[in-house]
């Protein structure tokens, strides 16, 4: 959907589907930054810094997106206070999520970090039972752990009665 330097400096809204936003380390390893779901917007941060185009966006399933170039988007923001406010609220939500993830990475072991992320997904779904919104290898990358560690921690959470899991279907049993 987007690659660094593809010449499409734009704001993208995901109309349907799911996508992951990631960067590549110097040695070529993928680092998942966030997950886009239906209705999410990406790229608006480049309204302030058009030199920093280093993120990839990859569809995780059939997806449709709408994009608008930056100069047109800036004009639209000037005409629509409601859109400007929505954008500020989205920035705030992302900032809170980024801070929460940074705290988790720096202060929590892998198991509690995984469980906290699963609880967040359940909260987003509005149910203790939900479908994991991304592949386990991408979840591991997002959490800053290896896929092997993720697998071990999933097994521990199941054995300790915190979750049940059948494929990507997860149920939180206790919090």
Regions found by a protein language model. Give the residues of each.
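Regulatory nucleotide-sensing modules
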Residues: 1-12, 16
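Polybasic "coupling" helices that flank or enter modular domains
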Residues: 78-144
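Structural motif
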Residues: 18, 40, 62-64, 138, ...
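Phosphate-/nucleic-acid-contacting segments
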Residues: 119-175
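Cyclic-nucleotide recognition modules
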Residues: 32-92, 96
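Cytochrome P450 core scaffold surrounding the K-helix E-X-X-R motif
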Residues: 21-25
């Amino acid at each position: 959907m987007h690659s660094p330097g593809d010449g499409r400096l734009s704001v993208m809204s995901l109309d349907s589907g799911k996508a992951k936003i990631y960067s590549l380390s110097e040695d070529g390893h993928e680092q998942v930054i966030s997950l886009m779901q239906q209705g999410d917007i990406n790229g608006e941060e480049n309204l302030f810094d058009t030199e920093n185009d280093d993120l990839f966006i990859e569809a995780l399933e059939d997806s449709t997106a709408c994009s608008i170039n930056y100069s047109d988007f800036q004009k639209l923001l000037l005409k629509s206070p409601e859109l400007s406010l929505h954008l500020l609220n989205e920035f705030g939500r992302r900032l809170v999520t980024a801070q929460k993830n940074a705290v988790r990475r720096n202060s929590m072991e892998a198991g509690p970090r995984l469980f906290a992320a699963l609880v967040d997904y359940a909260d987003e779904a509005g149910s203790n039972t939900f479908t994991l919104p991304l592949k386990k290898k991408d979840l591991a990358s997002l959490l800053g752990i290896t896929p092997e560690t993720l697998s071990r921690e999933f097994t521990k959470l199941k054995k300790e009665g915190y979750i049940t899991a059948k494929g990507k279907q997860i149920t939180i049993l206790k919090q």
